[in-house]
Amino acid sequence: MPKSEIRKLLQEIKKQVDNPGNSSTTEIKKMASEAGIDEQTAEEIYHLLTEFYQAVEEHGGIEKYMHSNISWLKIELELLSACYQIAILEDMKVLDISEMLSLNDLRIFPKTPSQLQNTYYKLKKELIQVEDIPKNKPGRKRKTQKNTKKEKTNIFGKVVPAEFKAPASIKEQISYDKSREKNLVDLLSGVKSNVQLLSENQGEENNVYDLLKSIYSLSSLAVQKEELDKKYQDLQTKCQELEQENSYLKQQNETMTDSFHTLVLQVADFAYASDLDQIQALPLFSQQLVVTLNQLGVFKENYKQM
């Protein structure tokens, strides 16, 4: 089933939840049946979405819920799992599903595509349970810490030492361990320090310029690589489509060749038969000839225009 059909079904479910009526489930089942989806699955999503919106109202409405200390409601996670499953069964990609369900499109969930996608994978890998998840509660359980003293961490989750000795000079500051270069913050800090060091020396403006120019050139190359990768993927997709089309045309050509060969044999058998055999075989020959001509795309309605 095309992606558009899944989208239309979910859009209709949301519409019926927003404006409930006596025939809501009937309309949803009808649309699901026409699209080839299990009616019970569609009805289940309808009830889950209804319960989710009711739970949101109990928390004071969508705005208060989004700014509350609740990251995910249990019913919301159940709905999330059901929506992904129904779309994945119809060969939709997780990325497209996340975009469709998010605030960017159908607005079924008050979440961004990345929030939906990350949570779906956590559910799939059983990193989180189907339960109410507070914002201050991580998906994985933390080990019990004997030391109750709060430790400072950077944005990468690494512990920062409580006591930090300021470097005596800029040269000391940029002499950090190369094994830490994978840390983006350290890299940017090192670049900044190098620029400051070069700027301290008089007459080194060209060195600063060359450094920044090199950084710009490298970043430009990275952007170009992303664009080339995308073009390469597009070309691969196009190549696959052409290969499929070529395979189809090849198969059609083989079929046409076989049909033409059959037609020649039928005409030859009839032409070289005796007069008596021709008279007796004429009705069967005519029927066989029509079948073979149809296989070649020649019909009574179009043969005069060919």
Curated annotation (Swiss-Prot):
One of the protein's GO biological processes: negative regulation of DNA-templated transcription
Pfam assignment, any one: MogR_DNAbind
GO MF term list: DNA-binding transcription repressor activity; transcription cis-regulatory region binding
Alphabetical list of InterPro entries matching this protein: MogR_DNA-bd (IPR021009), MogR_DNA-bd_sf (IPR038245)
Keyword Repressor: yes
GO CC, one annotated term: protein-DNA complex
Keywords: Cytoplasm, DNA-binding, Repressor, Transcription, Transcription regulation, Virulence
UniProt KW Transcription regulation keyword: yes
Cell location: Cytoplasm
Biological role: Transcriptional repressor of flagellar motility genes, such as flaA, during extracellular growth at 37 degrees Celsius and during intracellular infection. Binds directly to the gene promoter region and probably prevents RNA polymerase binding. At low temperatures, MogR repression activity is modulated by the DegU response regulator in an unknown mechanism. Required for full virulence.
Identification of the protein by name: Motility gene repressor MogR
Species annotation: Listeria monocytogenes serovar 1/2a (strain ATCC BAA-679 / EGD-e)
Taxonomic lineage: Bacteria, Bacillati, Bacillota, Bacilli, Bacillales
